[in-house]
C-alpha cells in the first residue's frame, strides 16, 4: 500500500516503546520511547524555545535535565494527559499525518481494565477526531505476524508479560494468563544488583543507562546454578560497559542474574510462577485435544524475549514440565521485537477486517462502551 492517503495507522503503544506506522508496511516507521520528560530546572536563556515537556527521543536526549515519566505502567495508562502528548507526537511529529483522515489501530494487553480501552476510544474519537478505530490484543497480533492461526504466544514487553493460547484464530480467554513482571522490573532489579557491586544508579536518567546495559549485555543462562559456579570460578563471563561520562564498569554474573528473574520471580519478591510455568499453566487450562498443537507452536514475542539463550532455556524448562513424549517447539522469530506492530499492519490491511472498524458514527450512537462489543 504505497498511498498513505487511505492507509490505516497502526500504533502499538508499549509501556516502554511506542511503535507506529502505516498498515501494509513491513516495519514501523517510528519507534521511540514512551516517555514524557519535564525540566527539573528553571529556564534562564530566553528565546531558546524551551518547552514545558518533551516526548520520546527528544526527552531521551535531554534526559540529563529532565524528570522522565512513563505514562503506561504494566500495560495500563496511568497518566492520560501524558498519553495524549505521546499520541499527538506520534501523529504530528513522527508520522506527519492528520489523524482525522486515517483509521487508527491501537493495541493493548489482555486482561486490562475495561476503562482503559474505553478512554483510549474516547480520546481517539473526541480529541483526534479519527474516522474509525480498533483496539487489538497484542499477543494475537504477534501470532498473525508469525503466519500461524494456532499457537500459544508468550508476549513479554516492558510493562507486562502474558500468555495467550489461540486455536484456529480464536483466542481462548479462560486460559489467558498475565504476569506483571517484565522489562522494567528487570531494569530495576539490575539497578539494585549493580548497587551491590558499588555502582549507584538512582535517577530516572540513570535508569535509562541501566536499561541500555541490560539490552546490550544480559543473557539467559541455560543452567543457572552452573553459570553461577562458572562466574565465581573465572572472569570469563565478565564484560565491560562504558558509561556516557567515559567511566568503564565491569559486570559479571549480573548479566544472567537479571533475566533469571523471568524464571524465578522470587528474586524480586514476587510470589508468582515464572514465564515457563505460566506458559505451561496456560496450556493446561486449554482443552486436552489442542494442547499438542500449542506445545508445538510456542511463539515468543516482545522486547523482553530478546535475551540471547531465552528460547533454549524455555525449551528446556517446558520439556521438563510437559509429558515426556510431547514435541515441544519454541519459535523465536528474529523480528519479534516488532511482531505486535507487524501483526497490526497485516490485520489492518486485510479486506475482511474493513467491516470490523468502529466508525465515528457508531461511537456517536453508542459511546465508548462500543469498544467492548466490537473488539475482542
From Swiss-Prot:
- Write the Enzyme Commission number(s) for this entry: 3.6.4.-
Query: Can you provide one Gene Ontology molecular function annotated for this UniProt record?
Result: ATP binding
Q: What class of enzyme is it?
A: hydrolase
Coiled-coil intervals, chain numbering = none
Keywords assigned by UniProt? Acetylation, ATP-binding, Cytoplasm, Cytoskeleton, Hydrolase, Nucleotide-binding
Residues modified to N-acetylaspartate? 3
Instruction: State the reactions this protein catalyses.
Output: ATP + H2O = ADP + phosphate + H(+)
| UniProt cross-references to SMART domains, sorted A to Z | ACTIN
Record InterPro entries? Actin (IPR004000), Actin/actin-like_CS (IPR020902), Actin_CS (IPR004001), ATPase_NBD (IPR043129)
Q: Which SUPFAM superfamilies match?
A: Actin-like ATPase domain
Question: Record's superkingdom?
Answer: Eukaryota
* GO cellular component terms attached to this protein's record: cytoplasm; cytoskeleton
CDD domains per the UniProt record, alphabetical: ASKHA_NBD_actin
Propeptide, chain numbering: 1-2
The compartments listed are: Cytoplasm; Cytoplasm, Cytoskeleton
Entry function: Actins are highly conserved proteins that are involved in various types of cell motility and are ubiquitously expressed in all eukaryotic cells.
UniProt similarity note: Belongs to the actin family.
Q: What is this protein called?
A: Actin, cytoskeletal
Amino acid at each position: 500500500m504505497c498511498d498513505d492517503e487511505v492507509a490505516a495507522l497502526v500504533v502499538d503503544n508499549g509501556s516502554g516503546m511506542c511503535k507506529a506506522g502505516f498498515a501494509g508496511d513491513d516495519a514501523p516507521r517510528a519507534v521511540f520511547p514512551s516517555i514524557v520528560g519535564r525540566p527539573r530546572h528553571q529556564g534562564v536563556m530566553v528565546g531558546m524555545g524551551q518547552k514545558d515537556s518533551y516526548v520520546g527521543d527528544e526527552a531521551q536526549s535531554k534526559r540529563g535535565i529532565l524528570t522522565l515519566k512513563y505514562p503506561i505502567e504494566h500495560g495500563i495508562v496511568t497518566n492520560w494527559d501524558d498519553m495524549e502528548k505521546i499520541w499527538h507526537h506520534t501523529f504530528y511529529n513522527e508520522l506527519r499525518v492528520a489523524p482525522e483522515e486515517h483509521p487508527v489501530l491501537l493495541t493493548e494487553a489482555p486482561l486490562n481494565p475495561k476503562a482503559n480501552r474505553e478512554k483510549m476510544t474516547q480520546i481517539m474519537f473526541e480529541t483526534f477526531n479519527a474516522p474509525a478505530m480498533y483496539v487489538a490484543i497484542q499477543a494475537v497480533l504477534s501470532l498473525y505476524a508469525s503466519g500461524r492461526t494456532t499457537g500459544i504466544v508468550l508476549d513479554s514487553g516492558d510493562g507486562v508479560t502474558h500468555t495467550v493460547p489461540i486455536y484456529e484464530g480464536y483466542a481462548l480467554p479462560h486460559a489467558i494468563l498475565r504476569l506483571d513482571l517484565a522489562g522494567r522490573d528487570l531494569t530495576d532489579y539490575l539497578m539494585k544488583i549493580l548497587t551491590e557491586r558499588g555502582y549507584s544508579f538512582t535517577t530516572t536518567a540513570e535508569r535509562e543507562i541501566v536499561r541500555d546495559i541490560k539490552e546490550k549485555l544480559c543473557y539467559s543462562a541455560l543452567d543457572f546454578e552452573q553459570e553461577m559456579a562458572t562466574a565465581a570460578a573465572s572472569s570469563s563471563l565478565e564484560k565491560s560497559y562504558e558509561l556516557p561520562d567515559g567511566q568503564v564498569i565491569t559486570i559479571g554474573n549480573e548479566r544472567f542474574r537479571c533475566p533469571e528473574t523471568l524464571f524465578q520471580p522470587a528474586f524480586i519478591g514476587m510470589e508468582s510462577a515464572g514465564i515457563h510455568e505460566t506458559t505451561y499453566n496456560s496450556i493446561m487450562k486449554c482443552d486436552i485435544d489442542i494442547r499438542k498443537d500449542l506445545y508445538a507452536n510456542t511463539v515468543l514475542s516482545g522486547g523482553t524475549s530478546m535475551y540471547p539463550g531465552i528460547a533454549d532455556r524455555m525449551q528446556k524448562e517446558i520439556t521438563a514440565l510437559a509429558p515426556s513424549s510431547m514435541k515441544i517447539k519454541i519459535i523465536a522469530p528474529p523480528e519479534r521485537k516488532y511482531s505486535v506492530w507487524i501483526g497490526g499492519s497485516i490485520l489492518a490491511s486485510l479486506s475482511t477486517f474493513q467491516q470490523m472498524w468502529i466508525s465515528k458514527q457508531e461511537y456517536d450512537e453508542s459511546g465508548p462502551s462500543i469498544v467492548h462489543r466490537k473488539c475482542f
